Design a protein with these regions (language model features):
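Macromolecular interaction modules
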Residues: 1-147
């Protein structure tokens, strides 16, 4: 049974092209490390959508096109406490001036884990995929709620 219950995604645009280096430095050395002490944060990863990746996207849409980075925090129980602490920490860091200002969140939020898959060639269980090193991801986001 997979202990990961939720993935909190953030799809981010950097609004000033000169700010990518500063954003990466802030995110890797300040913002992301602050999340890991929170109970319920199991893992965090961030991926860049390079120009080549953007050209290879299966879908183009006004909301998706500007996305430069996707961040994912994997969360375990207790979900209510974890999500509250996660949001509270973001607000506290922002109040301290520790939030990158040249960014725009285009989409994001907590999404329940529905199913995981692993190719037979990788020889690991599907449940272990979040812990396996990777060089990239292919993300699909679907609304599975009833109309």
């Amino acid at each position: 049974m997979n202990k990961i219950k939720v993935g909190f995604f953030s799809f981010t645009e950097i609004t000033d092209p000169k700010e990518h280096h500063a954003y990466n430095e802030w995110h890797q050395l300040d913002h992301m490390p602050e999340q890991f002490p929170l109970p319920g944060i199991a893992r965090g990863d961030r991926w860049v959508s390079t120009p080549a990746c953007r050209r290879a996207r299966a879908v183009s849409a006004p909301l998706l096109d500007p996305i430069h980075y996707v961040t994912l925090y994997l969360m375990t129980e207790p979900l209510d406490d974890t999500l509250r602490d996660f949001v509270d920490l973001g607000g506290a860091l922002r109040e301290l001036g520790r939030f990158h200002l040249h960014r725009r969140g285009l989409m994001g939020g907590a999404f329940y884990r529905v199913k995981e898959y692993a190719s037979p060639r990788v020889l690991v269980s599907a449940e272990s995929i979040p812990a396996r090193p990777q060089r990239g991801v292919y993300i699909t986001v679907q609304d599975v709620s009833p109309d």
